[in-house]
Amino acid sequence: MKTSLLRMIAAGALLAAAGSLLHADEAHPPATATTRVLPITHLWADAQGVSHFRDEKLSFEAATPENPTAGTTSRTNPDPEALVSLPLRGATGATFLYLKRAAVEDWHRAPRRMYLIAVQGMSEVTAGDGQVRRFGLGSIVLMDDLTGKGHITRAVGDVDPIALTIPVPAAPH
């Protein structure tokens, strides 16, 4: 029973993330055949330990001799770039994160560098520099504020927020 529930939640997470791209706002337009990018938010800490938000994009580029670590392409479609799989290199230990409705997590750092994908509800995050952003269904955040005082997380709205977290290796220095 527990395994089937987790599978159902995982499938829902993938569908939610994919579906949200169809309804993305203008600041984060969906990936298209023209843009081939996926917008994400990067929450990071500067040398003084103050966290900040930065908008970034994951590029769906096929591997080439010059860039052998890029994504893999379709082997069955006549157009090999009709499907490009972008691996999250080194990602193991994915978990679901639950936050009770109206809960507030005071100043804290990300426990490790990880992608966080919202699959239900909405959270409001305050960075160390005071900027506040809301993340709802399908939002992707690279949690990378591992030093300093971190950030505040609040559950907002009428639905308990749930997110899928995917740990990734530390950024190269």
Please report, for each region that a protein language model flagged, where it lies by residue.
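Bacterial N-terminal signal peptides
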Residues: 9-20
